[in-house]
Amino acid sequence: MKSVNAVTIKELYDLSHTEAKPLMEQYTYPWEVLPHIGEFIVKLGESLPKEEYTEVAEHVWVHKTAKVFASAYLAGPAIIGAETEVRQCACVRGNALVGKGCVIGNSTELKNVIIFDNVQVPHYNYVGDSILGFKSHMGAGSITSNVKSDKTLVHVKGIDPETNEKFDLETGLKKFGAMLGNHVEVGCNSVLNPGTVIGSNSNVYPLSPVRGFVPAESIYKTGGVIVKKHA
C-alpha cells in the first residue's frame, strides 16, 4: 500500500523539539521508531555533556535544572531534559526520552516513549509505547492502551485526508499505544486505544475512547464524531 502522508513523522512532528531527531529522521512512520528507543537513549546519554547532565543511576541521565521529586522512580535507560518536573510518585519504567520543560505528574507512568519538549502528562496518566509531540497535553486520568485485548498485532486505520479513501497500515507491533502530533489536547479520562494517531492541533473530548486516525485541526467528539475546527 502506498504511503499515507497524514500519519508520517514529517506531517505529525516538529523534530526541532526533541533530542530524538537523529533517530526519527531515519523512518517514515513514527511507530517504526518504537523498537529502537532504548538503544538510542543509551548512545545519546553517553554523549551528553557532563556539566549539564548527571547520571543518577545506570543509564539514567537527568539535566541539572530538572526537578525530580524524592518519591519518583526512574529506571534506565532514560533521559530527563532541562527544566522538566518529575513529580510525586511518577514511575519512569525505562526507554523514556523526556524533553525540555515537560511535566511528568503525580502517579504518571512512562514506558518506551519519546516525549517532545513542553509536553504535559500531569495527573494519573499512563503513556506506553507512544510518542507525544511538542506541547501536547493529556488531561487527568487519560491513558494510552498499548496492547489489544486479543493480543494480535496493531494496525493503524483511518481515512486518508488526501484521497478520502480508507487505509489500513500494518505495524508489525504487538505493543503500540498512541502517536500524538504537536499541540494535541486530550480530555480527562480518555482512552487512546492501540494504534491511535492524532494529527497536530487536534482536541479530544473528555471520556472519549479514541481509535484509529484523527486528522489534524480536528475535534474528536462524543460518540466518535470527528469535525474540523472552525468549520
Regions found by a protein language model. Give the residues of each.
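Terminal amphipathic alpha-helical/low-complexity segments used for targeting or macromolecular assembly
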Residues: 1-59, 167-171, 201, 207, ...
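Glycine-rich hexapeptide-repeat left-handed beta-helix
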Residues: 20-21, 115-117, 122-231
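Conserved hydrophobic/aromatic pocket- or pore-lining residues that grip, position, or stack substrates
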Residues: 29, 84, 113
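Glycine-rich active-site/cofactor-binding loop and its immediate structural neighborhood
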Residues: 62-107
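Surface-exposed, flexible loop/turn segments at secondary-structure boundaries
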Residues: 74, 80, 92, 110, ...
